Amino acid sequence: MAISSRNTLLAALAFIAFQAQAVNVTVAYQTSAEPAKVAQADNTFAKESGATVDWRKFDSGASIVRALASGDVQIGNLGSSPLAVAASQQVPIEVFLLASKLGNSEALVVKKTISKPEDLIGKRIAVPFISTTHYSLLAALKHWGIKPGQVEIVNLQPPAIIAAWQRGDIDGAYVWAPAVNALEKDGKVLTDSEQVGQWGAPTLDVWVVRKDFAEKHPEVVKAFAKSAIDAQQPYIANPDVWLKQPENISKLARLSGVPEGDVPGLVKGNTYLTPQQQTAELTGPVNKAIIDTAQFLKEQGKVPAVANDYSQYVTSRFVQ
């Protein structure tokens, strides 16, 4: 009886110790429809890391940057534009994983009466400020020879963009899913981020982590990267087969807020990376993308200063 009681006590103490060591992590995600959402839906990250995970949906990268800066969020999903702003403001974060290289999943959708870029002059175009689509909009206007001041650019979050479009308050918006799908129902795509990237202004979707959290819990960050990369590989290996599996489509539709019929087109709209490609991008190109984006945003008056190097905000150690 004494041995049994002692074992019970030891088990209880071990459980208490485990509870004390358990890691709580808040992850900020956005509504892009991409294969790694399957891992989110299946709670793979929590299972592999042993952490208690709180997934929180945000409408834009700018709000995620604020949450990261305050410490409310430890891991977050950002586009390259809010990333460049965060790095320029010295927010203590680092990129540890690429979610995707953005393509036609982000687009400038306008009223059907707008047939050419010049028709944008004097029109009211909405975009979430300091987002990848804000950067892409400014880059597109520059490519077309249109000054930002010639267009009324308004700062709206995606849900507000949908409402403003339905009321007729705006003539167009550069945005992502599910808002881009809502606007396309009775609008037209004037350009998208794949084309803008070909014009010299590519955009990325990345995962970042607070540096203090990464230093304290490297195994948790590594588990996150592994869960996301593993979820993407079946799609990379055979996109058509992956997209024909109903459970994949339903999971992405639920987390992205788009109709299931729209999911395949959105998934195909971006480029996803193998582990080897992740390492290659994180050891040079991502730093260059931050520099290029920050320099462009400085030209547009969106950031006050630009550094010559942002490599301290990028790491490949969690994907190797």
Swiss-Prot record:
Please classify the protein's predominant subcellular localization into one broad category.
Answer: periplasm
Q: Name one GO cellular component term.
A: outer membrane-bounded periplasmic space
Q: Which InterPro entries match?
A: ABC_Gly_betaine_transp_sub-bd (IPR007210), Peri-bd_TauA (IPR010068), Solute-binding_3/MltF_N (IPR001638)
A GO MF annotation of the entry reads: transmembrane transporter activity
Keywords assigned by UniProt, alphabetized: Periplasm, Signal, Transport
Q: Where in the cell is it found?
A: Periplasm
Q: Which residues form the signal peptide?
A: 1-22
Q: What induces it?
A: Repressed by sulfate or cysteine.
Instruction: Name any Gene Ontology BP term.
Output: cellular response to sulfur starvation
SUPFAM superfamilies noted in UniProt = Periplasmic binding protein-like II
List the NCBIfam families. Answer: PRK11480.1, taurine_ABC_bnd
Would you identify the family this protein belongs to, as annotated?
A: Belongs to the bacterial solute-binding protein SsuA/TauA family.
Q: Outline what the protein does.
A: Part of a binding-protein-dependent transport system for taurine.
Supply the name of the protein: Taurine-binding periplasmic protein
Q: Which organism is it from?
A: Escherichia coli (strain K12)
Q: What gene name is listed for this protein?
A: tauA
